[in-house]
């Protein structure tokens, strides 16, 4: 799911449920499969291998002698939110994977996503060209579950609007940025970049943030998580995607972590 190709059965809810079961106690593979897919349901297809593999790739579980155990502190899977923060903290480890590459390419398209094809299924071919490897419609269906869950934006029917507010909020916490402290914007980018290269341009000479990241930062500003500012005598100037309707129309120099 993350190391290579995306698969639709490995949805976040299944991965979380599997982790919660083994958080209670280690299970044999057969026991775990029965709890996840009880025989009385008479399912003709088993998806167990797909979501178990996703959990293993993420380092959430480990298997030894056909016994599956939790591989992280139980707090990492205490809730769907805590599992999301765990995954976001480790996402850069999968930079060669299909999920990472597709997410990176989609955000790099900037606001062009508003004017092109609206169905993720139809975007499989252009995204395949963008990342230089095959992407099919089923893999795009798998992508939508995780890209929404990890906080990169909002899904409306089969159109995905990039707004990385939840992801960025997680990354602010993961990076250990101090509440109440004002940072130059360059300092802020340096702090979050080890966890956010998937959507943040890692060339500091550009000093420009794409549409989805800009949407996320403005949302965090609006709800009081951060305060964006352009202080006139500051030279560390970064550009958001222009939006005249917002108090932060384009340029920023400082950011304060509010909560």
Predicted regions and their residues:
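Donor-sugar nucleotide-binding helix/loop cap in glycosyltransferases
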Residues: 1-259
């Amino acid at each position: 799911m993350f190391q290579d190709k995306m698969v639709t059965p490995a949805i976040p809810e299944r991965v979380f449920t599997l982790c919660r079961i083994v958080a209670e106690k280690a299970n044999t593979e057969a026991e775990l499969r029965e709890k996840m897919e009880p025989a009385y349901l008479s399912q003709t297809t088993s998806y167990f291998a797909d979501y178990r593999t996703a959990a293993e790739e993420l380092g959430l579980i480990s298997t030894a002698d056909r016994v599956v155990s939790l591989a992280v502190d139980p707090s990492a899977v205490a809730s769907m939110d805590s599992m999301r923060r765990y995954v976001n903290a480790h996402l850069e480890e999968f930079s060669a994977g299909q999920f990472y590459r597709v997410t990176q390419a989609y955000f790099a398209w900037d606001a062009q996503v508003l004017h092109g094809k609206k169905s993720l299924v139809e975007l499989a071919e252009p995204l395949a060209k963008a990342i230089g490897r095959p992407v099919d419609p089923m893999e795009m269906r798998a992508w939508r579950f995780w890209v929404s869950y990890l906080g990169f934006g909002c899904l409306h029917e089969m159109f995905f609007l990039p707004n990385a507010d939840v992801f960025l909020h997680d990354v602010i916490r993961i990076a250990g940025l101090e509440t109440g402290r004002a940072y130059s914007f360059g300092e802020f980018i340096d702090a979050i970049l080890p966890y956010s290269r998937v959507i943040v341009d890692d060339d500091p000479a550009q000093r420009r943030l794409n549409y989805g990241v800009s949407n996320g930062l403005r949302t965090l500003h609006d709800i009081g998580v951060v305060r964006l500012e352009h202080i006139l005598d500051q030279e560390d100037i970064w550009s958001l995607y222009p939006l005249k309707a917002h108090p932060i129309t384009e340029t920023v120099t400082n950011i304060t972590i509010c909560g």
